[in-house]
Amino acid sequence: MALVASGSAQANQTISNAALSERVQTSDEWIRTRTGIQSRRVSTPDESLNDLAIRAGQQALAMAQWEPDSLDLVLLATSTPDDLFGSAPRVQAGLKAQNAVAFDLTAACSGFLFALVTAAQYPVSYTHLTLPTILRV
């Protein structure tokens, strides 16, 4: 098993510690010394998790040189879905991965690890899938 491609996307807006300290009782120095964080990305009203996930997925597909309809699984690991019913099916539709099963996995900071393990185990449970195909997620 191997990871053969990846994609990433980030929100367009940046908020500095100084701007954050105007909203909550803190300071740039307090945040920076305890976390090392200087700024963070936040979605604008016209950006959603789905948009970011679709962009990242498109990058991964391009890097791997795979067509979206070759995907068997779209697994979205997030603690911030766009709605309570999950975002993976919308990402699947946005990627045009009509042959893929799509579901969300919510596991906070360990979400990536759980998603990786789940994706690796998926072809074991569903033997009609091939391992290279499932890793196209």
Where does each model-flagged region fall?
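Conserved beta-strand segments that form the floor/walls of ligand-binding pockets within enzyme
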Residues: 2, 75, 104, 130
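Conserved catalytic cysteine-centered active-site region
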Residues: 32-51, 78-126
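Short alpha-helical scaffold segments that flank and stabilize functional sites
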Residues: 56-63, 91, 118, 122, ...
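Conserved small/polar residues in nucleotide/adenosyl-binding loops
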Residues: 127-133
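Active-site glycine-rich loop that binds ribose-phosphate moieties when present
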Residues: 136
